Amino acid sequence: FCYEMAESLSKIAQALGKDAKIHIKLDTGMNRIGFKPTKESVDIIEKIAKLPNIKIQGIFTHFACADEADKTETYEQERKYDQFITWLEERDIYIPIKHVSNSASIIDLDGFRKDMVRSGIITYGLYPSEEVSKDVLDLRPAMELKTHIVYIKEVEAGEGISYNHTYVTDKKTKIATIPVGYADGYPRSLSSKGKVLIRGQYAPIIGRICMDQF
């Protein structure tokens, strides 16, 4: 996504006697990494294409709002991408593999699939958002996380649970502690919202998820 990176790859590839096969990242609206869709970027990519032992195999962008019902921004990103491809080909730079579709656009925008797609969250059986179609793919969660209860205690009504006491018991309650937290990648956003399955019965997550337990 920058000339300096390609130049470094070229030097390494030459030293190893191999070709570095790369894909160019184009930033059409995500505003993270990638070349901006400008004529100046075309100049840089033309220079990259001439570097020794560099083979440009693909060029891609990433949609910022494809999981929203309103696809206006996504269509605009696609327009910028297509325009940039036209500019490259006017310079006789033909890149064989073109890809733009993430999970949401795989579902809702089948005309954007081009040469390949990049399935992300749908690979795990989850929909990107509540706003995408549920009719195209019948998704089911493909992963589960198993652990053990490490401690059980009873607390009286009116007791606050975990950090900041965001959950307060309204009756005498049995509390189980599970040794998983946000340090393990378990989303803290599930605090007082998520559920766990214990011997076939759902139990609510109460209180704030900690670094290593909830």
Identify what each model region corresponds to.
Residues 101, 150-152, 199, 206:
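Generic beta-strand/beta-sheet core signal
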Residues 1-5:
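A glycine-rich helix N-cap at a beta->alpha junction
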Residues 173, 183-185, 189-214:
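Compact, glycine-rich, soluble single-domain proteins
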Residues 15, 140-143, 168-169, 187, ...:
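Sterically constrained small-residue positions within well-ordered secondary structures
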Residues 145-192:
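Functionally critical, mid-to-C-terminal surface segments that flank or help form catalytic/ligand
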Residues 6-7, 11-21, 28-148, 155-156:
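Active-site loop/helix belt of alpha/beta enzymes
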